[in-house]
Design a protein with these regions (language model features):
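Surface-exposed loop/turn motifs in large extracellular/passenger domains
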Residues: 10-20, 36-53, 67-83, 99-122, ...
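Short glycine/acidic-rich loop motifs that flank beta-strands on beta-rich extracellular proteins
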Residues: 1-8, 15, 24-34, 52-63, ...
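C-terminal effector modules
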Residues: 162-172
């Protein structure tokens, strides 16, 4: 299943978690994930740092935050991530949506997400790696805010800014 995953199945907070200095080979689901089950009051201060994804052939997002419960999700950092063999994958996927794993009848929100120093070194997949990546809130009230991208490098080219506001199509 997911290689590194943060879930919050009970009450209280889920916070101050660091995954670092690791090499991931992923055969099913996502290499790095926060969610889907996020039933705590707060899920915050989660960091994925200095990680190599050397294989993930699932087509799933490489870095994901999937939320469908009531938690306030904030301050999630993906930093110094190197990616190699990942055919068909999305670079990231951040969503608030209903799912079969949700137990709450109230949605939360997602705030302050940082992707920095991400380097993709694969031989294919360039066309969908970013274009299929998405940021998708649930409603105006339950939304995603303050997502930052710094130094995103795809095979030697830096992703700059969205080509069109509101779309996940990036130019190099």
């Amino acid at each position: 299943d997911d290689s590194f995953v943060v879930k919050a199945l009970g009450t209280g907070n889920c916070e101050n978690i660091i995954f670092k200095n690791s090499v991931l080979w992923n055969d099913f689901a996502r290499p790095m994930e926060v969610g889907v089950e996020l039933r705590a009051d707060k899920v915050r201060n989660i960091k994925f740092e200095n990680i190599d994804i050397i294989h993930s052939d699932t087509g799933y997002p490489l870095m994901g935050i999937h939320h469908g419960d009531h938690a306030e999700v904030s301050d999630i950092v993906f930093d110094n991530i190197r990616i190699e063999d990942t055919p068909g994958a999305q670079l990231f996927d951040i969503r608030i949506a209903d799912s079969v794993w949700n137990r709450d009848n109230k949605m939360g929100d997602i705030r302050n997400i940082t992707f920095s120093n991400i380097k993709y070194l694969g031989t294919d997949n360039n066309d969908i790696l970013l274009s299929n990546s998405r940021i998708e809130g649930y409603s105006e009230k339950h939304n995603i805010r303050n997502v930052n991208f710094q130094n995103i490098n795809i095979n030697g080219k830096y992703a700059l800014t969205p080509k069109e506001p509101g779309r996940n199509v990036y130019e190099f």
